[in-house]
Design a protein with these regions (language model features):
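Ligand-site clamp/hinge motif
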Residues: 1-6, 10, 44, 133-136, ...
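Structural transition elements
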Residues: 66-107, 125-128
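Long beta-strand-rich cores associated with HINT superfamily self-processing modules
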Residues: 248-275
Length: 275
């Protein structure tokens, strides 16, 4: 946002800005094979502690993170309506009640006050490091003591792939609004090695196949919602922090350009220069 404002201020009426939802997001990835994160109560407590709605307001002022959403892009054709989204663990608007529940789950799971764990993150200033700082603060609100470990991309990815982490900050960036593309990240790790959360869930794998083969749109949406509830809430395997927002400043003489949700597939068919 600040860079957008600088461009507009410098170029004045010679520039214009287009914004759009983005098929990218930040994911919180607990290591489902490492104690105590092998206990779904602990994983659920971590997501309950995150104030996504407050974080959206704050982080959208300093980063391109912003929209709150589930497994499908907010604003997209398969997006979960807010009334349904807020029923998922960690996506409700009453953060005080959510954190009270998070503390209860941690106590029930035997996690002591001040429990220390590492949060491994990518050494990229935007948006990974602000996301990590925010998450560390959120988890401290429920009595945990996370340590933010920032790594170069090579060691960071090697640790995620090897399971050498407690909690990781991951991401997805896709090219098309379709459940076949967005949901594959969450099928069992032995079916998709890009699922770093290290779990096996044949029910999820079956739901993925079902929705992919379903021709009726409404029935497909129902299966996608069932998949989403299991991943993000019922089992809390891994979950989104926030989705990203595309901000594209360009010269006004660039005509016919329409910003879309993917930076991989731009629609340039009708682009032309007015001078």
């Amino acid at each position: 946002p600040a860079q957008r404002d600088e461009v507009v201020q410098f170029l004045g009426d010679r520039a214009t800005v287009q914004e759009s939802g983005w098929l990218c997001n930040i994911l919180v990835v607990p290591n489902n094979q490492r104690k105590p994160f092998d206990d779904f109560r602990v994983r659920r407590a971590l997501t309950l502690a995150i104030d996504r709605w407050g974080g959206s307001r704050a982080l959208s002022q300093i980063t391109f993170m912003g929209p709150v959403g589930g497994v499908m892009r907010p604003g997209g054709p398969f997006a979960t309506p807010e009334a349904e989204l807020t029923k998922l663990a960690g996506f409700g608007r009453d953060i005080n009640a959510a954190r009270q529940e998070a503390r209860r789950l941690l106590r029930e799971a035997g996690v002591p006050e001040g429990f220390e764990f590492t949060v491994k993150n990518r050494n990229i200033p935007m948006p990974y490091i602000p996301a990590g700082i925010f998450l560390v603060d959120q988890w401290r609100q429920v009595g945990l003591n996370p340590r933010h470990v920032i790594q170069e991309t090579g060691p960071y990815l090697a640790d995620l792939r090897a399971g050498n982490y407690d909690v990781g900050i991951d991401f997805t960036c896709d090219f098309f609004d379709d459940p076949d593309v967005q949901l594959v990240k969450f099928v069992s790790s032995d079916r998709n090695p890009l699922n770093y959360a290290r779990y096996t869930d044949r029910l999820l794998d079956g739901l993925f196949r079902q929705q992919s083969r379903e021709r009726d749109l409404q029935r497909r949406l129902q299966i996608v919602r069932q998949f989403e509830r299991r991943v993000l809430s019922d089992r809390a395997y891994q979950y989104h922090l926030l989705w990203w927002q595309r901000i594209v400043p360009h010269w006004k003489k660039l005509q016919g350009y329409r910003v879309g949700p993917s930076h991989y597939l731009e629609d340039l068919e009708e682009v032309w220069l007015s001078e």
